A protein has these predicted regions:
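Hydrophobic alpha-helical segments at protein termini of multi-pass membrane proteins
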Residues: 1-173
């Protein structure tokens, strides 16, 4: 998928991962309880960023021809979601609600719409207007979910009305 959309999705997934790393670092400095969870999500978003370019999830279809990768993806999302309920419960309600909405939008596109379009693939109808419209809906949902997540995370890192956090990166020889 060599397109602007793929490039943009890769960048925002990477940005989400970097922001989770920053939040993990801030939690560590402040003796927060969620350092590990933020680090887990940082790694996860970086993997999703790589997957967006490389298409690792599509490789799963070649390994398990009888089952769509979305089946395995749904199981993984369910496990991760359940395992992170305590983490979500510790977040402020606004952040938690925005994260859940963002996740639902992203997963709805990545797994829901993708699963719904499997029919087009099975019936060799991937070069149709209908399939391409569904693909646009899928990509829009994924991008919107990540942008909302980034918004919520930035708002969580620097709450409205508080002094901004200054992060400085220096490169030395």
């Amino acid at each position: 998928e060599e397109s602007f959309g793929t490039w943009y999705s890769t960048l925002i997934l990477f940005a989400a991962g970097q922001l989770c790393l920053i939040q993990s670092w801030l939690e560590c400095k402040g003796a927060g309880r969620s350092t590990g969870s933020w680090l887990f999500f940082a790694v996860g978003f970086h993997i999703l960023s790589i997957d967006e370019v490389v298409g690792l999830h599509e490789y799963v279809n070649t390994l398990a021809e009888d089952t769509s990768w979305t089946t395995y993806g749904a199981i993984i999302v369910l496990i991760i979601g359940l395992a992170n309920l305590p983490f979500l419960a510790r977040l402020p309600s606004r952040t938690r609600n925005l994260f859940v909405i963002a996740g639902a939008i992203y997963v709805g596109g990545a797994l829901g719409v993708e699963r719904a379009t499997d029919w087009y693939d099975v019936n060799d109808l991937m070069n149709t207007l209908a399939y391409n419209l569904w693909t646009a809906v899928e990509e829009f949902m994924e991008m919107s979910g990540i942008v909302l997540f980034i918004f919520a995370l930035l708002e969580h890192i620097v709450p409205v009305g508080q002094k901004p956090v200054r992060i400085e990166i220096q490169f030395r020889r």
